């Protein structure tokens, strides 16, 4: 029986960007739940003047440049003696000013102090991300109400910008830049899983697996059970599983087995949390090989046990891969049940039909083979392997039959279909059937098995779930030399395609 799916062993990219609402800067802000974060913004004089300058900066944000007012605030609140009286109001205003400065395109995050308003040590450097964190930490520590108020402050535009920069950089494999941006993001806010997820990928790229594991744990902890972060949790679990699998593949001896067990745990954790189908399919494929490496082949049926009892919870591809795993481990009854679940959902799934027929043959359920092969050859008529399934079926029926007349009839049918398969002058095979939001692509080959060079025309109907023809495409193929093959491709922008059939080649 042919293996249908190779291990889908790739790491999906992080989300391209994140978005969040940006709260406005407030005077004596109210925290969540109605509790107030109160501090007096009228004293000392430096705080009062900075409060007025902040109001002017807010007005300038509408269409002007608030940088002069922001520099004034920084200068006032860092003057000699300004730190000691009313430190919470000072820190709140200073953190707000630094955040707004980070939004200005002319201000560098690592800036010369004088450019942001400092008069003390004016030629030194200031890290505005660290400065924001230091200021807002003072406010957070002043009361629970203020701590609640500061949370949305930390996730304003500068945090969004640097976090998205980290995501974009890691997706572009610019890992050094991604690390810088992610750590700046964490300086502003440590409650989001996104920067930890970025750093997980960065350390994976460096093969620094202890650091990767640490960041992965932090990402999962930050994501918690929040449904907003479901994609992040799945991404992290997939990273952990694929990394442990890769390490197991390159390891030897006891370490190889230990890493295989680690990967098994990671894949099972992923499967327990309802991953998207492509990752569920990867989990099934990888778990099968990992159990062998770990010396625990007896556990392979556990991979698909829940699929047998509740196939509706799983996608077509994952069920198909599970059927392959079951058949490879000589469990044709399980394989047949899984392939049948695919066919019940999608009667135009030729790989499932092919393997379902083969599973019935292994089970000696010969009378179940015919209807399956009839459907298969209706979809895929110019593949001799499909017609050979009839020959295997009649061979089984013939051997089990006691009545001479029926034995002879079955023998005649066996010879008929075996001859048809052997003498078919061409063979159609498919190498890709991909479907996504951009359309549908079918790629295959035609082999000239006998005779002179010949050209063919592939005419393919793409079918929806009800069997309706969504699109008909044709592709000229040839001339094809004897004993040679040529590729064909048929593409359409049509979506909603679940299967295909083609006209018999002549």
Question: What positions do the PLM features span?
Answer:
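Canonical positions in the second alpha-helix
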Residues: 80, 135-139, 184-185, 218-219, ...
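Canonical tetratricopeptide repeat
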Residues: 93-94, 164, 198, 232-235, ...
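Short coil turns that delineate tetratricopeptide repeat
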Residues: 84-85, 144, 190, 224, ...
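Single-residue signature of alpha-solenoid repeat helices
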Residues: 73, 125-128, 132, 178, ...
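TPR alpha-solenoid repeat register
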Residues: 90, 148-149, 195, 229-230, ...
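Short coil/linker segments at helix-helix boundaries
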Residues: 56-71, 99-176, 221-265
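Register position in tetratricopeptide repeats
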Residues: 100, 171, 205-206, 239, ...
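Hydrophobic/aromatic packing residues within the alpha-helices of TPR/SEL1-like helical repeat arrays
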Residues: 70, 77, 129-132, 136, ...
């Amino acid at each position: 029986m042919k293996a249908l799916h190779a291990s889908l062993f790739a790491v999906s990219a992080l989300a391209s960007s994140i978005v969040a609402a940006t709260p406005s800067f407030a005077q004596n802000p109210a925290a969540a739940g109605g509790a107030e974060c109160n501090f007096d913004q009228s004293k000392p004089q430096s705080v009062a003047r900075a409060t007025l300058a902040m109001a002017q900066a807010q007005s300038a944000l509408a269409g002007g440049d608030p940088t002069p007012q922001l520099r004034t605030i920084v200068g006032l609140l860092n003057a000699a003696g300004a730190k000691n009286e009313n430190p919470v109001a000072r820190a709140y205003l200073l953190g707000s000013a630094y955040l707004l400065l980070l939004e200005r395109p002319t201000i560098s995050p690592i800036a010369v102090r004088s450019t942001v308003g400092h008069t003390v040590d004016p030629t030194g450097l200031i890290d505005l991300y660290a400065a924001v964190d230091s200021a807002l930490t003072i406010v957070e520590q002043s009361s629970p109400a203020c701590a609640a108020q500061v949370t949305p402050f930390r996730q304003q535009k500068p945090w969004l910008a640097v976090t998205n920069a980290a995501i974009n950089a890691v997706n572009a494999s610019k890992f050094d830049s991604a690390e810088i941006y992610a750590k700046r993001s964490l300086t502003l806010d440590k409650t989001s899983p996104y920067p930890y997820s970025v750093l997980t990928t960065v350390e994976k790229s460096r093969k620094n697996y202890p650091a990767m594991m640490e960041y992965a744990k932090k990402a999962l902890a930050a994501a918690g059970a929040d449904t907003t972060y479901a994609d992040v949790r799945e991404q992290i679990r997939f990273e952990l599983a694929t990394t442990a699998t890769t390490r197991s593949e390159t390891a030897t001896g006891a370490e190889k087995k230990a890493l295989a067990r680690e990967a098994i745990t990671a894949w099972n954790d992923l499967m327990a949390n309802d991953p998207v189908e492509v990752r569920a399919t990867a989990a099934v494929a990888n778990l099968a090989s990992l159990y062998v490496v770990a010396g625990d082949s007896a556990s392979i049926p556990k991979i698909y046990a829940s699929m047998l009892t509740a196939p509706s919870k799983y996608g077509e591809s994952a069920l198909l891969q599970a059927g392959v795993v079951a058949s490879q481990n000589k469990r044709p009854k399980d394989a047949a049940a899984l392939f049948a679940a695919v066919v019940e959902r999608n009667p135009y799934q030729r790989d499932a039909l092919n393997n379902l027929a083969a599973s019935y043959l292994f089970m000696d359920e010969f009378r179940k083979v015919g209807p399956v092969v009839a459907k298969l050859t209706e979809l895929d008529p110019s593949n001799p392997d499909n017609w050979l399934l009839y020959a295997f079926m009649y061979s089984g029926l013939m051997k089990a039959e006691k009545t001479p007349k029926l034995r002879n009839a079955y023998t005649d049918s066996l010879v008929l279909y075996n001859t048809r398969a052997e003498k078919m002058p061409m063979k159609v095979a498919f190498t890709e059937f991909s479907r996504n939001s951009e359309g549908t692509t079918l790629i295959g080959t035609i082999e000239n098995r006998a005779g002179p060079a010949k050209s063919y025309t592939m005419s393919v109907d793409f079918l929806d779930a009800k069997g309706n023809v969504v699109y008909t495409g044709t592709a000229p193929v040839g001339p094809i030399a004897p004993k040679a093959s040529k590729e064909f491709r048929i593409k359409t922008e049509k979506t909603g395609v679940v299967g295909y059939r083609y006209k018999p080649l002549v």
